[in-house]
A protein has these predicted regions:
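Repeated scaffold domains used in trafficking and secretory/extracellular systems
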Residues: 47-57, 104-120, 161-173, 209-227, ...
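An edge-strand/N-cap motif at the start of beta-rich repeat modules
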Residues: 27-93
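Residue position within the beta-strands of beta-propeller blades
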Residues: 62-64, 72-73, 127-130, 177-179, ...
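C-terminal motif of bacterial Sec signal peptides marking the signal peptidase cleavage site
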Residues: 14-17
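Surface-exposed loop/turn elements that mediate protein-protein interactions on large endomembrane-trafficking
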Residues: 38-46, 77-104, 137-158, 188-210, ...
Length: 459
């Protein structure tokens, strides 16, 4: 099962598919950026107009950071730049319109000098969450690239020790909204930062989080959906033995900053096929109602998974409704354990199905399979396109986005050798696998085509 980790760890993995490691050139927060991050003493208002949920996808464009070696397959990392990918054509160009810019310094709006950069598109504007780390400190910083792609502004620098919950970011016509986990993982605070002046306002602090112990902690509230001036959040509550699990929903009203507890979605006790004993036997349980927070794609919300009947649905927690996505998926049964993962896009849904072979004691047999299905209008189509990843055997292609009838995916792999430097300055070489990205018509993908148009990078 895919588990959502705290963003401090997830940034280095595949949370939004737009993080990218860059050279370790950690800057020090300046007095100006620290002052910009200071909270307002007396917040007068909390934004205006309708909220918009942000992801890397926006209006037919997908924003992602690429190093030079991912583009040219060279043996040195080179620059790291933020690119805007046109999903219709496959054209990818730096998010910079400065005349004559060589895109080779921090003067370029598209320059990525953080260790990790996550991108959030809002029309032509781009918000950046940068994570800086070295041996001495680590911290996050919010920045914004203007709609004309000529200016880049620091909005807020986060104090070391706090973690940004990177899945679930929203804006309105005044503010950017995000939340922070304290270092002790017991408190989470929802903040608003003025996108024009960098002034911060604290909206609400949750004090009901677990203490960060156990496999499924730290607990955190994830932003699921926005509507008007309301933000809907949910946190997963789960015991360390993983037998009890629920999603607790709440709503934050930005007209007055109030919070309202909402419904609680609890997983059923399930059909126990094998009762674990903590030693030789492992639990094998088929659940009828299991819930997951969507952590990938361009839609937020909850997935409802029925491992007994093979059904997957989408829960709109804001209005407490369930919409079927598709059915007929493999089920958890004697000898097999199944898990489903749901991602939402503008053009449909992607369901991952992981099947794990289990023996009579519930332990793994090593017979594992992973399939992915694209679903729209209640009809599912298995995506059989695959790629060979050296060292990892054959893998499914990786879908990043599906909007306006087009799909952006990592559809192949390139292998090479790169140079790196140890902390003591010693140069060494190591093998490297690069994803090859391309676009394709959704209808062609569903028909089984592998005729992707590779991304065309330009300066």
């Amino acid at each position: 099962m895919k588990k959502y980790l705290a963003i401090a760890a997830a940034l280095a993995l595949t949370l939004t598919a737009c993080g990218q490691a860059a050279a370790d050139s950690t800057p020090t927060p300046t007095a100006a950026t620290e002052a910009a991050a200071a909270p307002a003493e007396q917040p007068q208002s909390i934004g205006s107009d309708a909220l918009r949920l942000l992801t890397a996808a926006a209006d037919g464009v997908y924003y992602q950071v690429f190093n030079d070696w991912e583009i040219n397959y060279t043996d040195t990392m080179g620059r790291a730049l933020i690119y805007a990918i046109d999903e219709q054509t496959g054209d990818a160009r730096p998010v910079c319109n400065l005349p004559g810019c060589a895109h080779d310094s921090a003067a370029c709006p598209a320059w990525s000098d953080g260790n990790v950069t996550l991108c959030y598109g809002d029309g032509d504007e781009v918000y950046l969450l940068l994570f800086y780390y070295n041996d001495e400190t680590s911290y996050y910083r919010w920045e914004r690239i203007s709609a004309d792609h000529t200016q880049r502004t620091v909005l807020a620098t986060i104090e070391p020790g706090q973690s940004v919950v990177g899945r679930g970011v929203a804006v309105d016509d005044v503010n950017l909204y995000y939340s922070l986990l304290d270092e002790d993982n017991r408190h989470q605070t929802l903040w608003a930062v003025d996108t024009a002046g960098g002034q911060m306002q604290r909206i609400y602090t949750w004090d009901d989080l677990a203490d960060g112990t156990g496999e499924y902690c730290p607990e955190m509230y994830m932003l699921l959906e926005v509507s008007g001036r309301q933000m809907t959040f949910a946190k997963m509550v789960q015991t360390n033995d993983a037998l009890t699990k629920a999603m607790q929903v709440c709503a934050v009203n930005l007209t007055d900053g109030s919070i309202t507890p909402r419904q609680r979605y609890e997983r059923d006790t399930g059909n126990v096929l094998v009762q674990g004993d903590g030693m030789e036997k492992r639990n094998l349980i088929s659940y009828r109602n299991d819930y997951h927070i969507l952590t990938e794609g361009s839609r937020g919300g909850l997935a409802n998974c029925n491992y007994q009947s093979g059904e997957v649905g989408f829960v709109d927690a804001a209005v407490d409704t369930l919409t079927p996505v598709a059915d007929g998926f493999p089920t958890t049964r004697d000898g097999w354990e199944c898990y489903y993962s749901l991602s939402g896009f503008a053009d449909g849904w992607l369901v991952w199905v992981d099947e794990y072979g289990r023996d009579e004691d519930g332990n793994g047999t090593g017979e594992n399979t992973t399939r992915q299905y694209f679903c729209r209008d209640g009809v599912k189509t298995e995506l059989t396109q695959q790629r060979y990843v050296p060292g990892k055997d054959v893998r499914n292609i990786r879908i990043l986005d599906a909007q306006q009838g087009r799909v952006l995916a990592a559809y192949d792999t390139k292998t090479g050798t790169v140079h790196d430097v140890d902390k003591d300055g010693t140069t060494y070489t190591q093998p490297m696998n690069w994803d090859i990205y391309g676009v394709i018509a959704l209808d062609d993908l569903l028909a089984g085509s592998t005729d992707f148009t590779p991304l065309a990078f330009s300066d």
